[in-house]
Amino acid sequence: MARVDLKRRGEIGRERRARTRAQLIEAARRLFTTRPFSSVTVEEVTRQAGLSKGAFYSHFRGLDDLWAAVAAELAEAFEDVAGASGRPVADPVGRIAAGCAAFISEAQRDPGWGALIARGAWDFADVACAARERLKANLRLAQKEGRLAPISIEVGFDLVFGVVIQAMRSASEARLSPHDVPDVVLGILRALGLSAEEAEGALERAGATARGASSAPTAI
């Protein structure tokens, strides 16, 4: 009788489970790119993945569990862009400009990711949580320096975050070209209260990132 390698059998089982879970999450991501989260069913996810409902329920208790898994991946992907290496930008307004440009440019480079983030950033509180806090911190610092309009930080946050998310959606739908990215960022900075000259200077300090590159020196 052949000897059974229980350790290897266990490894194979874990690898198979990991692949099945990844298939389900990827299927959900593809559906979520064009559909509201609440409209997707278990049947559609399993059909998209080519798996049975039994396979689904061996990995997730239900759709809420699946949403959470997708959200966790989105948050990780968002932070990967946010934490991309590059030269640091000391100026808080320059950091805002660099971060805005990086996320929009990444949505142009990877439209599926951009579309999913554009949806998930509003639907899942955990997505972009760290980037949200960094943006607010940079807004507070810039306002303390007297460089922004006298608006609340929450209003400033909604302005920046809302425009960036919409621009990411437009970029993922090929309605925004790389040449449009600086104009979007300049519009955000002007809306925050910077003069045209100050906004151009911040864009320059943000470096190549704000001219359409896909990696951020320091995220918003």
Regions found by a protein language model. Give the residues of each.
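C-terminal peripheral helix-coil segments that are non-catalytic and often amphipathic
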Residues: 1-8, 137-144, 173-220
